[in-house]
A protein has these predicted regions:
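Pyridoxal 5′-phosphate
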Residues: 1-240
């Protein structure tokens, strides 16, 4: 019996809270059978790069072995099958977010690429010298660097929504900060450092009342809570 099989055999009944079987969840991730410095691996960096459960690894392995082909670029059997699977994945994401249609789902490499895409399009069409972008001081770099680049290229102004000593955004300041020059508000749904869950629905309502679109960085939120993009009414909701 190999080390992985022995580890699986040791997986016992639920050891966490009711309905939350920690050992069963760990058993689904092959990498967690490793030991580091003589102790079981505990991985806490999923916000940056998540480990893959066995089902994902096996699905990717199967696709590369038996189904790989161009998507939306061929008429042969493998290409058609790959396209169907690709669009099925888009529909799965749509259901996950309760988006209005699969056409609203745009695949990118990661959240940074998604925000770059929005920033570049707005920069070409909407944002010029002196126009404003409202961010918060609790943003991940993925939601800071693209706007810094846009500021350097276009001469835009970055404005920063402050937070309290308790790590909560001062939402009352937002209404005052938004002016006729404000082109977008870009805010994290959940802080990757503090764990603060921001009232993004209220933020979106305030911005929309002044005709300003909103981008929400949901990278931390989507794995910790249900997200309904139709209920939030965000213009852009990105995650990785």
């Amino acid at each position: 019996m190999g080390s992985e099989a022995r580890a699986m055999a040791k997986a016992g009944p639920a050891s966490g809270a009711a309905g939350y079987d920690v050992e069963r969840i760990r058993a689904d991730f092959p990498i967690l059978y490793r030991e580091v410095h003589g102790k079981p691996l505990v991985y806490l960096d999923s916000g940056a790069s998540a480990q893959k459960p066995r089902s994902v690894i096996e699905a990717m392995d199967h696709a590369y072995r038996f189904e790989y082909a161009n998507v939306h670029r061929g008429l042969h059997h493998l290409s058609n099958a790959a396209t169907e699977n690709f669009e099925a994945a888009r529909e799965t994401v749509r259901r996950f977010l309760n988006a209005g249609s699969a056409g609203e789902i745009v695949f990118t490499r990661n959240a940074t690429s998604a925000i770059n895409l929005v920033a570049n399009v707005l920069g070409q069409k909407e944002i010029g010298e002196g126009d404003e972008i409202v961010l918060s001081i609790m943003e991940h770099h993925a939601n800071i660097v693209p706007w810094h680049f846009l500021r350097e290229r276009q001469g835009a102004v970055l404005k920063w929504l402050p937070m309290s000593d308790q790590g909560e955004l001062l939402i009352d300041e937002l209404d005052r900060m938004i002016t006729k020059r404000t082109k977008i508000v870009a805010i994290t749904h959940m802080s990757n450092v503090l764990g603060t869950v921001n009232p993004v629905k209220d933020i979106i309502h305030i911005a929309h009342a002044k005709g300003v679109p909103v981008l929400i960085d949901g990278s931390q939120a989507v794995v910790h809570m249900p997200v309904d993009v139709r209920d939030l009414d965000a213009d852009f909701y990105v995650f990785t």
